Every structure is written in structure tokens, then in C-alpha cells.
Amino acid sequence: MRAYLDLLQRVVDEGVPKGDRTGTGTLSVFGHQMRFDLRAGFPLVTTKKVHTRSVFGELLWFLRGDTNVKWLQDRGITIWDEWADEQGDLGPVYGYQWRSWPTPDGRHVDQIAQVVEQIRDSPDSRRHVVSAWNVADIPDMALAPCHTMFQFYVAPPGPGEESGPGRLSCQLYQRSADVFLGVPFNIASYALLTHMVAQVTGLEVGDFVHTLGDAHLYSNHLDQARLQLTREPRPLPRLVLDSSVTELDAFDLEHIAVEGYDPHPGIKAPIAV
């Protein structure tokens, strides 16, 4: 995970002071890209402990099309509580856009089902894209999408693998990236999604490419970032998915595990709401 530490170091060294919606203040850089070979291990930050149950549960919640925090809370996951209303609702956020994008004629598009079908039927298509950035719905969202759009790419088998399956890669564009708290979650979440989609489409995994727009450290995360930068990365863990799961909607928390995760201790930091 040296790529993540390089990002952290870049923001500390080159970030410019900027105000922000929360009033906290940030150091910010614009435009950064990281690439992770998913065959080399599961890209889970090791220089601090990441709460994997929250990462995995949040992704499953998105894939359910859910926009109420109750499902998360029932599983001990509270990462969205600060933005929910009294009924636990968040408005038409990620899950709604992924699974039920509204059309002008009153229909809804299940982008996730559509992209899985496209990967199976037309792997060479350049339209394997899912977007959460629905301009018309943003005013009704508790929080505008930070990770806005992702695209899958199917590469043919490499040299010596002519008879094997292709490799599935994913690129995420993230318009707003909380480098200390959010980005480690985002990397692991989309790496997991790539593994899951690869499994249900009969492919191997390739790369996860993470492209960031405004990559920032909040002013009250700077000491924590500097502490993290003193730590040496440890070997990446291995992701284990239950091989009996053949449809994306069938995945549950019990089907997802990591082996060999040996991180440095966690580093607490306040979340900017």
C-alpha cells in the first residue's frame, strides 16, 4: 500500500489550504491516481487498522439499493448515522442511484444488474459504467456522492493464459476524497466490488485504478497523517469469497473474509460532517 502513503505524503507536502463545506478547513491537491494489482493481494491499508466489517457491510448495503441506515445499524455499522434524518433516511444516495436510477418517463434503471449482464454478454464493450452523480437528485441527498462513477474493463487472457478467463479491472472517479478517513475505505470497497463482479461473471481480477479529483486532508487530521507516515506497510491480506455465490445479490457478510490482515493499531480522527 505504498501508493496510499505516497498520496498521503503528497497532500502533506504539496496541499494548498482551502475552505470546505464543513467549515473544518483542508490541505488539498487536485488530480491524483493510484493503481492496485488485485492479484498481488487485497489492498487494505496496513499502516492503521481499517474496520473491515464496515467496509463490507456498506458495499452490500449499496448493492441492496438501500438508503436507510437501519440495515447497517442492525449489523453494528454506524458510519452513515451522522447524515441520516430522524427516520434513518438519507435520500436518493448511492444505493438508489445504482439500483433504481429514475428516468424521465417514470421508469427506473438497475445500473448494477445492467453492467453485470453487459460484462457477461459483451465483455469488450466500453459502456460498463455505473454513475451515482444524478444532478437532479443531488438537492435531496443527505450527502452528494463523493465516489461518483466507476467503469469496468475486461482484458483478454494474457500470454500463456490463452484458454483461461479474462481479467476484470475497475476504475473509480472520486470527485471528493477524504484522504485520511475515507480513501482507505473506498480502495477496499471498490477492490471488493471488483472481486465480487469477477466471481459472478466468471473472470479473474485485474487492477483497481483509483482516480481522485479534490484529494484533501482535513486540518484536524494532519497529526494523524504524519503519525501514519512513520509506519512501514505490512504484507497485504488475502480476500476470500465464498465460491458458491454465483449472483451478486446473493452475497452477504458471511460470504466475505480476509486472511492474514496484520495492521498497525488504529488511529482515531474526527469525521467532518
Curated annotation (Swiss-Prot):
UniProt keyword list: Cytoplasm, Methyltransferase, Nucleotide biosynthesis, Transferase
Summarizing the function annotation, the protein's role is: Catalyzes the reductive methylation of 2'-deoxyuridine-5'-monophosphate (dUMP) to 2'-deoxythymidine-5'-monophosphate (dTMP) while utilizing 5,10-methylenetetrahydrofolate (mTHF) as the methyl donor and reductant in the reaction, yielding dihydrofolate (DHF) as a by-product. This enzymatic reaction provides an intracellular de novo source of dTMP, an essential precursor for DNA biosynthesis.
Enumerate the residues binding dUMP: 21, 126-127, 175-178, 186, 216-218
The record's family statement is: Belongs to the thymidylate synthase family. Bacterial-type ThyA subfamily.
Recorded hits in PANTHER family, A to Z, give: THYMIDYLATE SYNTHASE (PTHR11548:SF9), THYMIDYLATE SYNTHASE 1 (PTHR11548)
Q: What class of enzyme is it?
A: transferase
What are the annotated GO cellular component locations? cytosol
Q: Which HAMAP family match?
A: Thymidy_synth_bact
Q: Which residues form the active site?
A: 146 (nucleophile)
Q: What is this protein called?
A: Thymidylate synthase
Q: Where does (6R)-5,10-methylene-5,6,7,8-tetrahydrofolate bind?
A: 51, 178, 272
In which pathway is this protein known to take part? Pyrimidine metabolism; dTTP biosynthesis
What compartments host this protein? Answer: Cytoplasm
